[in-house]
Amino acid sequence: MATSQAAKRRAMAKKRAKKKRNKILLLITEFFVLALLVVVVYGVTKTEKVTKVRIDEEEIKAKMNDNVVDSVVLKGYRNIALFGVDSREGSLGKGTRSDTIIIASINNDTGDIRLCSVYRDTYLNLGNDSYNKCNAAYAKGGPEQAINMLNMNMDLNITDYVTVGFEGLIQTIDALGGVYIDVQQNEIVHLNNYQISMVGKTTDKKTYTATEGVDYIAVKEPGLQKLNGLQATAYCRIRYVGDDFMRAQRQRTVLAAVMDECKKTDPATLNKILEAALPNVATSLDVSEMTAMLGNVTKYNITGSDGFPFETNRSTGTVGSKGSCVIPVHLDENVALLHKFLFDEETYQVSAQVQQYSQKVSSDTGR
């Protein structure tokens, strides 16, 4: 009997201790969430530092291809255009060519993200029925024309964008404490040369514009290592190893590494990132959208990345005065592959507009 009562007391004590631990855990969790919210609100108060480039969403929707606006499949995803520009003069809008073009497709239900680089030299309709290398769209009409270019050529419904200057990427990665990248031996010399070009060092051939307040630290060995902001940004820009296709892959690799570090970060570091990044960012997203995305950062996972045109359906060649271009072979086939990759549409039928643009690209390039 005494043994039974002692067992009951031990069980009750264990239960009370468990409840106490759960209560403490709940308090710690609530404190952390509150702290995170405070930091997010603090960051939102700084959104006047973000460059707001006005875009006409209704005009963008008016230029979308047949059946895109009402697509049931596309409504299950949030598609955002990401642009990276080399603008140390502070210009993030029209007049600056986009060195980086990435479609980020977020599954609304799962939080899974798939990234697709659009190779900047791809020969496409620029969104105004003229044809050239696709990165010219941003230079000619800023983010709005670049979004139209993506939507029209690829049957997409993008209405939002984020543009980051390379200096913003440098500062963001430094605020995170660096990112881990596996650097190959044949990439080191080019990585260091791009660093030199961005910090204002002088070489025998050329004097470069300085990136203020950034020091050059040479990468000396291959292998997995932590790169600082300048090193990682220089890594993104390498195009002499694997050409522009590998360059785009490196950009996606760095973006994924940044995402991994952000998911592990604490509120104080998040504050540093906001301070560093916001002055070098232009976006169409409003305060509530940015707050919601920051609040869901732990939900997001990058589950796939690729490049457009796809490896099996592209070639390179000279297209008259446009010079050397990446040529989709053929555009309509690549768009079908894109919808399979981003949205799991196995038998996607491209729009009549994409068929028309595909014929024009083939006619101009002879492919």
Model feature map: region roles:
Residues K140-D204, A210, S284-D286, M290:
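Amphipathic, coiled-coil-like alpha-helical scaffolding segments used for oligomerization/assembly
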Residues M64-D70, Y77, L126, N280-R367:
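C-terminal solvent-exposed extensions
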Residues T3-G111, A292-G295:
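Entry/capping segment at the start of metal-dependent catalytic domains
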Residues D174-T269:
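Flexible, polar/acidic helix-loop-strand segments at domain edges
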Residues K75-R78, T96-I101, T110-V118, D129, ...:
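Extracytoplasmic
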Residues E89-L92, N132-K140, D155-D160, P222, ...:
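Second-shell loop/turn segments in exported
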Residues V73-N79, V85, G93-R97, G127, ...:
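Solvent-exposed, acidic/flexible segments
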Residues S98-T100, Y131, P143-N151, F166-I170, ...:
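Extracytoplasmic/secreted envelope proteins and their assembly/folding machinery
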